[in-house]
Amino acid sequence: MLDQDTVKILADLSLTMFNKNFFGIYHGAISTKQDEYSFMINTRDAIFDRMDEKSFCSLNINKQDYRWNIASMESDIHATIYANIHEAKYIAFGMPIYTTAYTLNHNKIVLEDFFGKTTFGEISIYN
């Protein structure tokens, strides 16, 4: 059984990220570590602006079972991060929907924090 408070937190965060164009309808993944051996992640058919308990599943970090078939396609990546970075509690993977269009008219992508105060680096765009 999934913790309802955790589902609410992830659903609210998912809606915010969806509204800011970090998640598309079916693009992205969001998860939280439940304990040392398990984590909760969205299902592969989750709609990020309408998440509820049915939009998530609980997975074992070390062992794949039938639940991995309905989980997000990024589940392996999340499991690896949780297994190797023990302090990790939440992971969100998103790709802004206009990134590809942006690359058509620009030579680089500048990575900034949410408030735009810190620059994390640049990615050159090659044709």
List each model region and its residues.
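Glycine-rich flexible loops
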Residues: 1-127
